[in-house]
Amino acid sequence: MSLLIHISDTHFGTEKPPVVAALVALARERRPDVLVFSGDVTQRARQSEFAAAADFCRELGIARMLALPGNHDIPLFDVVGRLFRPYAGYLEAFGPRLEPFVETQDLFVVGVNTTRPNRHKNGVVSAEQVARVSSQLRQARRGQLRIVVTHQPAAVSRPEDEHDRLRGAGPALQAWSVAGADLVLGGHIHLPYVLDLATGPQAVARPMWCVQAGTAVSERVRHGTCNSVNLIEWSTPRAGEPRRCAVERWDYSAKAGGFETAERRILPLA
């Protein structure tokens, strides 16, 4: 079995130390194979915040990581930096690739940079990005769980969040479904949920799921939610067995002083 941990929206600069410590403990206990970090690493793209985030990732002790920038990882008040060096701090902390790719024997994970320096927070996926990701997905093996990662949500669970939905998501989801994607992971709105993308008026062509993470360690939790992360389990099916994965949401409990399983779902795949 392979295990992936999906965290998002840590917003270092607003982190809660007890929650950070609890997440490190969870990672060391469960020992995931891959860390997916779907953006908004920092609160204000400050060097000290990026340094704290990088230290945190090292403390997790996970060998493979795919990280993406979020809109908060581009300077907001430093106009010169936003115009001419929008990703300088992020790249210094997390390496030279804004659209990374991670592959293991069982996992195939493609990152898409949906931030734009000329936009305050709204995300965009371009036709070129859709085509690139589709081409990559077609190279995956059937035995691999095929995952696309964005920052802004590719689908939303409530009408009031529609304005935060990724621009260009409709055509992207259709194309990525045809190309073989199983899951699309994201963050941005600090609301964890799992959506079946193969149902509804804009249903995709084959089973595919949107999996959103809440804010992992920040004090900026939405009303009615708490700090949370996702754990995704995948085992390559034997001949004749159906493809499916498990998604667990782990919520932080101040009473317990750690993360606890809040929900577990088995997702059927094609």
Describe the predicted segments one by one.
Residues 6-8, 35-40, 64-71, 113, ...:
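Active-site neighborhood of phospho(di)ester-bond hydrolases with catalytic His/Asp-centered motifs
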Residues 234-270:
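A short C-terminal boundary segment appended to hydrolase-like catalytic domains
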Residues 1, 32, 62-64, 141-145, ...:
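A general structural motif
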Residues 162-238:
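Conserved beta-sheet core of the metallophosphoesterase superfamily
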Residues 1-59, 77-80, 132:
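N-terminal active-site segment of His-dependent metallophosphoesterases
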Residues 51-132, 140, 175, 203-207:
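Extended active-site neighborhood of metal-dependent phosphoesterases/phosphodiesterases
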